[in-house]
């Protein structure tokens, strides 16, 4: 998993609340069990005018030329609500997004994102609105998300602080998924196993 320390990138926004996982990645695209290849289906029902995904919707934000290559997504409260599917952060990451900034997230989506190297950043509604206004007013506007300092820096230079559980921050800073986190304690696990009485082995 790619470590997340600090990232500066083009920002795009979807100014909507309660964006659920079926909107992020519709159920008909969930048959794969590997993480790659989901980005093309991200927000399928909004991005395309046809079921096959051949006709882009020119009015959808992510399809606008000025936002091509965006790596930071701004959204409103309760992002990632709905059914539990790890494919949602897979699709967002495969599309090229590194961080999602919103006032709140659904709990399961929040945890799944951290486990898959996608940083969910909670800011106040007013702070998110300021970021959206700045991004909308300036083509090519970039935002910096610094996990080492837990700060978001707006296109104008305004700084906003955010919090993240230290365990989640450690995993993201070091690029550790659940398996990687376990392997990082290999020495301690080995010592524990070496000291297990023979009758318990």
Curated annotation (Swiss-Prot):
Catalytic activity: (2R,3S)-3-isopropylmalate = (2S)-2-isopropylmalate
Keyword Lyase listed: yes
Catalytic activity, EC: 4.2.1.33
Cellular compartments per GO CC: 3-isopropylmalate dehydratase complex
Keywords, ordered alphabetically: Amino-acid biosynthesis, Branched-chain amino acid biosynthesis, Leucine biosynthesis, Lyase
GO MF assignments: 3-isopropylmalate dehydratase activity
Signal peptide: none
Domain of life: Bacteria
InterPro entries associated with the record: 3-IsopropMal_deHydase_ssu, Aconitase/3IPM_dehydase_swvl, AconitaseA/IPMdHydase_ssu_swvl, IPMI_Swivel, LeuD
Gene Ontology annotations of biological process type: L-leucine biosynthetic process
Functional pathway: Amino-acid biosynthesis; L-leucine biosynthesis; L-leucine from 3-methyl-2-oxobutanoate: step 2/4
Similarity annotation: Belongs to the LeuD family. LeuD type 1 subfamily.
Protein function: Catalyzes the isomerization between 2-isopropylmalate and 3-isopropylmalate, via the formation of 2-isopropylmaleate.
Quaternary data: Heterodimer of LeuC and LeuD.
NCBIfam families noted in UniProt: leuD, PRK01641.1
Name listed for the protein in its UniProt record: 3-isopropylmalate dehydratase small subunit
Gene: leuD
């Amino acid at each position: 998993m790619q470590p997340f320390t600090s990232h500066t990138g083009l920002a795009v926004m979807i100014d909507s609340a309660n964006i659920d996982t079926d909107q992020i990645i519709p159920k008909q695209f969930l048959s794969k069990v590997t993480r790659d290849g989901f980005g093309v289906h991200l927000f399928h029902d909004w991005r395309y005018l046809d079921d096959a995904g051949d006709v882009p919707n020119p009015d959808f934000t992510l399809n606008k030329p000025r936002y091509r290559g965006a790596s930071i997504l701004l959204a409103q409260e309760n992002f990632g609500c709905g059914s539990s599917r790890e494919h949602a952060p897979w699709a967002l990451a495969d599309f090229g997004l590194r961080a999602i900034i919103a006032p709140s997230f659904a709990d399961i989506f929040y945890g799944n994102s951290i486990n898959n190297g996608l940083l969910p950043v909670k800011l106040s509604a007013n702070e998110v609105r300021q970021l959206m206004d700045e991004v909308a007013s300036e083509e090519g506007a970039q935002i910096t998300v610094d996990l080492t300092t837990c700060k978001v820096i707006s296109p104008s230079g305004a700084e906003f602080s955010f919090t993240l559980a230290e365990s989640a921050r450690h995993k993201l800073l070091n690029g550790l998924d659940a398996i990687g986190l376990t392997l990082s304690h290999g020495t301690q696990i080995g010592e524990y196993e070496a000291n297990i009485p023979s009758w318990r082995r």
